[in-house]
Each structure stands twice: as C-alpha cells, then as structure tokens.
Amino acid sequence: MEDIIRIIQDGSLDGEKYFQSLKERQGKENAEIIKTVKFIIDNVKENGDKALIEYTSKFDKVELQSIEVTKEEIKAAYSKVENDFICALKTAKENIEEYHSKQVQNSYVITKENGIVMGRTVRGLDKVGIYVPGGTAAYPSSVIMNAVPAKVAGVNKIIMTTPPMKDGFVNPSILVAADLAGVDKIYKVGGAQAIAALAFGTETIDKVDKIVGPGNIFVAMAKKSVYGFVDIDMIAGPSEILVISDETGNPKFIAADLMSQAEHDTLASSILVTTSKELIGKVIEEIKLQVEGLSRKEIILEALRNFGAIILVDSISRAIEIGNVVAPEHLEIITPNPFEYLNDIKNAGSIFLGSYSPEPLGDYMAGPNHVLPTSGTARFSSPLSVDDFVKKSSYLYYSEKALRNVNDKVVKIAETEGLTAHANSIKVRFK
C-alpha cells in the first residue's frame, strides 16, 4: 500500500494534472446506455404497467403480480428492523424537519396608491416522485432527505419508486423510512423504467411534476431524458470530500473522514489540503491502519489511488482558495477556530466545521440536506431544499386610474420594441 494516495506540492504540474483528472473522471456519455434508456422510456410510455412488470422480471429477476406496496407490507416492515434503528430515524427526521422548516417562504402582497395590488403566491408542487435505490443496498437516509423537505414544502402527494429485493418485497428499512417521512404511495419499480413511469404516468403510477433521488447511470440518464417533461433535482456525479486542516488536525479523524467518501465508489474523490508536512505522514499511516477493518476496503483503496490527493500548501487561506476552485460536495474545516474561515468559503455544497462535525453526521442526522451539488457545480448550485418543492406565481391588479397613469409609458416601451399589438392592448382601453 505504498502509493495509497498521491501527495502533491501546491503549484506543481502534478497538481494541474490531478485537477484535470477530476474534471474528466465521469467520461463521455455512453451512446449504448442512452439508446437503451430511450427504448425503455418509449416502452413504458406505450405499454405502462405491463412494461414495468416485464422489466422487473428482466432486471431484478422478480415476478410481480402487483407493483404497489400494500399497507400490510409497510406495517410488517416495522417488525423486521431494530427498534434502535426506528428511534434513530425518528430523531433524524425531527432534525431534518426542524432545519428545513426555516426555509419556508411565505406569499406576500404589496399595495400602492390608486388601487395597485401585486404580490407573489408560494405553494407546494402537486405531485413529486422520489427514486430510491433498492435491493440489498438500502439507503433509508435518502428517503428522509428527499421526502421531508417535500412534506415541509406542502407537496400534495409524494410517490416513491424503488426496486424490490429477490423475494419480491421492498427492503424493510426503506419502507419504515418512507412511512415515517410521510410518503403517500410506494411502488416496486427501479431503474430507468421507474423514472419513465413517474414522468409520464402508467395505469397505476401517477405522473408527477418533479423527480428527485439518486440512482445508477441508467437512472441518471433517464432523469436527464425526461427533464423538460418534468422537473428534476440534479444529475449527481461521484461523491467528493475536501478537508482543510492545519497541524492541529487529528490524523485519525481526517483519515476516517476521507475514507467515508472513498467507500461510495471508485470514482469518489477524497482530498486533504494541509499546511502540515507532519500531518500528511500521520494521515497516511491512519488510512493504512483503519482501512483493514472496513468492509469496502478494496473500493476505498482504489478510489484513493485513482482520485484521492493530499495537497501541501503554505497557508490556510491558500487551502481555501483551492477549496473554492474545486467547489466540493462536502468541505471540512479542521482548525482551532473554523468559524473564522466560514465566510471565505464561496463554493461548497455543505460545510462541516471542527473536529466533531464529520461529514457522515450530515449524511444521516444533523438536519442540513445530504443531497448536494457535485462535480464542481457547487459554484452555481445549492443543496436540495424546501425551495425545490414549491412553485411561485406573481399576480397584479391595476385599477383604471392606475393604468391610465402609466398608459403612455407602457405604450412607448411596447412601440419601441416594435410590438404594436402590445401597445394596442393598452391604447384600446382608453379610446
């Protein structure tokens, strides 16, 4: 494990090559995958539930009579998971609810003289679809992170799709999370076919207004394909963490945090930017020690070799500059007073301050959303929030007197733009 992770001196050619490799790691879109996804979407649009059942048989090796999860199945799921897990999920849900409730925006109205009234209405979307990866790899945290903000936003109906396990049932931890989070309907459908069903509807599954949730490359391509017919949250890239630390950082903690993201997949990037040469050696030793006890050891090691890096810089301010260029999904600041640097962080999905605010805390429990922009998109994108589940409409009312007061001005602008019918719409009211 000698070359466990690359070490880069800031300003070197190695650094430039490394950052270029991060940009290129997802590669080009696969034409065969795009073709397959298009075929699946068209098939679901044409054949509805029949296509869903056939794809479940083909891809999940499960023969289903019905794709809808029953109330009895949801009730039975509670007996199949530990009480401690249920308790933990309830606490997480409460924290996520509390955090997201602060994001709620209210409608407003402005009244002016001469009978002018204008304002904005804010209302939840009618129907939202949540995609949750299923099978043996269950992620109940994805359920609550997507469903709770939708619920807080006032979404009328939340529909969830997730592939069944080999026994034809949905993973019980997923069902419990969905029930606690207030999901209204759950269907045993996965892959691109689930996205197609949510986007266009079938005999059983309602067409939704927005689709959220993570998935594999087929799910991602399907979401991209249906965007415009429905809204989507984002196309997520590989997981990322960038840790900024000085010499006071605990190497055990830093090594553990870097590996927590590396275990996602071999394209994940784990980066430490530090001012301390001594810390580098200690972190590498800790990685070697800790990785031996981890179930996803091979994935972690490959991710660290492929896209991991430790960058030596001469100051924390330079480390922050690098962080702002990378615009990582997760950014940790491990210094004696991390709050002094908070306002300097311009580009990051979520920021974790101090030694006892590790990234997995945000994944599961604290309250901020774990659905975050990746691949540098934190430069212009934000974490999933209540705002993603609402729509806003503006409205206005002018009395005759109010319109007469601005009549000439409106006409002048319309005529300058050459839109005479616009101008006529105003003029005709005062002839």
UniProtKB/Swiss-Prot annotation:
Superkingdom as given in the UniProt entry:
Bacteria
Give the protein family.
Belongs to the histidinol dehydrogenase family.
PANTHER family reported for this sequence: HISTIDINE BIOSYNTHESIS TRIFUNCTIONAL PROTEIN, HISTIDINOL DEHYDROGENASE HDH
- The name this protein carries in UniProt is Histidinol dehydrogenase
UniProtKB keywords:
Amino-acid biosynthesis, Histidine biosynthesis, Metal-binding, NAD, Oxidoreductase, Zinc
Encoding gene per record: hisD
Task: Give the cofactors, semicolon-separated.
Answer: Zn(2+)
Q: How is the cofactor bound?
A: Binds 1 zinc ion per subunit.
Question: For Zn(2+), which residues are the binding ones?
Answer: Q261, H264, D363, H422
Q: Sum up the protein's function in the record's words.
A: Catalyzes the sequential NAD-dependent oxidations of L-histidinol to L-histidinaldehyde and then to L-histidine.
CDD domains given in the database record: Histidinol_dh
Listed Pfam families: Histidinol_dh
Q: In which pathway does it act?
A: Amino-acid biosynthesis; L-histidine biosynthesis; L-histidine from 5-phospho-alpha-D-ribose 1-diphosphate: step 9/9
List, from the UniProt record, the residues annotated as the active site of this protein. Answer: E329, H330
* Catalyzed reaction equations: L-histidinol + 2 NAD(+) + H2O = L-histidine + 2 NADH + 3 H(+)
Q: Which PROSITE patterns match?
A: HISOL_DEHYDROGENASE
Annotated NCBIfam families? hisD
Q: Which GO terms describe its cellular component?
A: cytosol
A GO MF label: NAD binding
Its Enzyme Commission number(s) read: 1.1.1.23
Which InterPro entries does this entry report, sorted A to Z? Ald_DH/histidinol_DH, Histidinol_DH_CS, Histidinol_DH_monofunct, Hstdl_DH
Tell me the Gene Ontology biological-process terms attached to this UniProt entry. L-histidine biosynthetic process
Residue numbers binding NAD(+)? Y131, Q193, N216
In this chain, substrate is annotated as bound at S239, Q261, H264, H330, D363, E417, H422
